């Protein structure tokens, strides 16, 4: 009996070592530039740029197949960050892909919702919870404001509500300078 256990343990260790070696040996390297570009994009997965999501758009920019000014949710600020990363001149946002809008989240009127689940299927980030024939709810922290859930709704119970700029959603608009850096630069 102990022989069978030791054989199984030995096989498990051998297979584990082979799999570990294979993972290191045949590791697929991603494009580091595409990963940096993807980190700058807003991750709304809205498709307004003409690509199915932010990652494919980042890969197309890295390959030179797409321009840096096709992301309306990223706005002019996103275009400037991409231009800085790639070392090119910033361009105005391409209006053919849409215009920047204030940040907003979807809101479902639960009294009108019929529970058809079409909005759940359309949401690229799974920000809608609910079941068939029951009312649905938006998970506001997950919603990216892509508006892809609006069109499939047969009863138009979904609306976009701007995010209030209160304390939890407030963002400092100016560059952050660390006090330690300021103190070091003023020393003689």
Swiss-Prot record:
According to its UniProt record, this protein's enzyme class is translocase
Q: Where in the cell is it found?
A: Cell inner membrane
Query: Region (Hydrophobic) spans which residues?
Result: 1-23
Positions with a binding annotation for [4Fe-4S] cluster 1: 46, 49, 54, 71
Residue ranges of domain 4Fe-4S ferredoxin-type in the record: 104-133, 134-163
Please list the cofactors this protein needs: [4Fe-4S] cluster
Keywords for this entry? 4Fe-4S, Cell inner membrane, Cell membrane, Electron transport, Iron, Iron-sulfur, Membrane, Metal-binding, Repeat, Translocase, Transport
Task: Cite the 4Fe-4S domain residue spans from the record.
Answer: 29-88
| E.C. code | 7.-.-.-
Bilayer-spanning residue ranges: none
> GO MF annotations for this entry?
4 iron, 4 sulfur cluster binding; electron transfer activity; metal ion binding
Q: What is its main location?
A: membrane
Q: Name one GO biological process term.
A: electron transport chain
Statement: the UniProt record of this protein carries the keyword Repeat: yes
Q: Which GO terms describe its cellular component?
A: plasma membrane
**NCBIfam families in the record, alphabetically?**
PRK05113.1 (NF003475), rnfB (TIGR01944)
Give the record's family classification: Belongs to the 4Fe4S bacterial-type ferredoxin family. RnfB subfamily.
Q: What is this protein called?
A: Ion-translocating oxidoreductase complex subunit B
Q: What gene makes this protein?
A: rnfB
